[in-house]
Amino acid sequence: MQAEIGIIGGSGLYSMPGVSDVQEVRVTTPFGEPSDPYVLGTLAGRKVAFLARHGRGHRLLPTELNFRANIHGFKQLGVERIISVSAVGSLKEEHRPLEFVIPDQFYDRTKQRVSTFFGEGIVAHVGFGDPVCGEMAKVVKHATDKAGVVAKAGGTYVCMEGPQFSTKAESNLYRSWGFDVIGMTNLQEAKLAREAELCYVTVAMVTDYDCWHPDHDAVTVDQIVAVLLKNAENACSVVREAVAAMPKDRTCKCGSALATAIITNKDVVPAATKEKLKLIIGKYFGEQKAGA
């Protein structure tokens, strides 16, 4: 069974209500095992694949996530677009708990992550100036409006290593830099989705004010979970509306991100590397059709 739209559920969102014709699929990738089996089915008349980012039961730290396997697994299933739902802390007064942000920029503060499919004899530099698919972001913003959810379009998501939350010094530094929200996972997903030529958008659910706000307690796990439980229905409604409204065909440039990115002559790329990356680079090396 194939899918066209991928959904990544973050903290508090480990399943997607409303999906019919459900089939659970374990996918093995050249980069190892994804976080969990993918749940395939039909949502709002579209074929979707859902993945619990941290595994059901929330077993995996952000640093432990196999981001490459997660994204490659979606690619193997035929997915072309990914909606990533994530809990975030707010770095601005105007982004209140229970509200959503649809970031259009990311800033990387991670230290221990693998953020590329390339290496091992092949070099590629994809454009990442606009890390989010603009077409998807518009659809998601319209979906939040239709679902009656307060959401801001645009803003910067700073991705920290974790698993500890920020110090006040860090939180205030990020605020001084003008960042909007803080999380621990979406930067790697966005980079790898771009390399895999998949469209990607984040639906950031604000759960707290990190630790900077003088009138609010510093973030705790209990606080996050309580807000997420209240927000789960909103998140599912937004995803459902977005899936229903997503155009059938892509007219953005995400699907050709590697067209001018691969710098290594294909004749010198090791055979093992070619095989490992076949699904991603095959159409440029004349070894498969796009989307195969």
From Swiss-Prot:
Question: Which GO terms label this protein's molecular function in UniProt?
Answer: S-methyl-5-thioadenosine phosphorylase activity
Which reaction does this chain catalyze? S-methyl-5'-thioadenosine + phosphate = 5-(methylsulfanyl)-alpha-D-ribose 1-phosphate + adenine
Q: Does the record carry Glycosyltransferase as a key word?
A: yes
| Entry's Gene Ontology cellular component terms | cytosol
Q: Which Gene3D superfamilies match?
A: Nucleoside phosphorylase domain
Alphabetically ordered keywords of this record: Glycosyltransferase, Purine salvage, Transferase
Q: Which InterPro entries match?
A: MTAP, Nucleoside_phosphorylase_d, Nucleoside_phosphorylase_sf
Per the record, the pathway is: Amino-acid biosynthesis; L-methionine biosynthesis via salvage pathway; S-methyl-5-thio-alpha-D-ribose 1-phosphate from S-methyl-5'-thioadenosine (phosphorylase route): step 1/1
UniProt binding sites for phosphate: S11, R53, H54, S86, A87, T185
Q: Which SUPFAM superfamilies match?
A: Purine and uridine phosphorylases
* UniProt subunit comment: Homohexamer. Dimer of a homotrimer.
Q: What is this protein called?
A: S-methyl-5'-thioadenosine phosphorylase
